Amino acid sequence: MFYHNSSIFHPTTFFLIGIPGLEEVHGWISLPFCSVYLVALLGNVTILLVIKTEKTLREPIFYFLAILSTIDLALSTTSVLRMLGIFWFDAHEISFGACVAQMFLIHAFTGMEAEVLLAMAFDRYVAICAPLHYTTILTSRVLMGISMCIVIRPVLLTLPMIYLVYHLPFCQAYIIPHSYCEHMGIAKLSCGNIRINDIYGLFVVSFFVLNLVLIGISYVYILWAVFCLPSQDARLKALSTCGSHIGVICVFYIPSVFSFLTHRFGHKIPRYIHILVANLYLIIPPSLNPIIYGIKTKQIWEPVLRAFIKK
């Protein structure tokens, strides 16, 4: 079960329990999980197809939306397929390398989603606070630079987690009371000192907080600019362009904050609640994001409606 690596013992496999305490109803729990995953697949693929086929959707906000949908597809697939394997086929065992790989992908894609939301906030800030300079500020070169930051920064923040996990000793513990692999879930199985893992985890969380603060600052300027507009119609029109983005921010950050608080301070909360919240944090945003943008954005739902009418 364990192999030796430079005086550090690693298990050859981990055992993912799924949702501790609810093992007998895993089959029933899988139904909403599978449904939400299918909604995420259908919704995000639809968004990508509409943006690709509609020549009018070439504004930067739709470019960021396409990136968001791509990340949502990757994040939901990385997490939900492993969960369904546990629920349906009792595929609890996962190799050490595969577990670390899943940990890296989940944390990296989650970080990328936070970066995209920040980029979208910047887009809305420029569109409302400096509309005459919108096309000169958000040029193709700037969009390319932002896209690289969206990918590179989360990857660089997540890579040290691999090093930290590989340098932990694992004595006899290999059972993870979770349905997927994440950094602290693996670290807590170690019989060594995980203080550096804990500190680094908080360091990574601080970047999510920083992004949220920057988004908040951008919306302070946006609201100031909106309320300076002369007519109520102009104010409502400006605010309506931010509605979808605000909805997506809430869908992403509210479950993540709740998950963080239950993990840090909810010691009296049953373990299965912790795991369910952590699962919802990964699967709900990818399924709701395309719905929010599809309903609120006329340029998105009109082509979809035309396609159904033709059929």
What are these regions (language model features)?
Residues 1-311:
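Transmembrane helical core of 7TM receptor-like proteins
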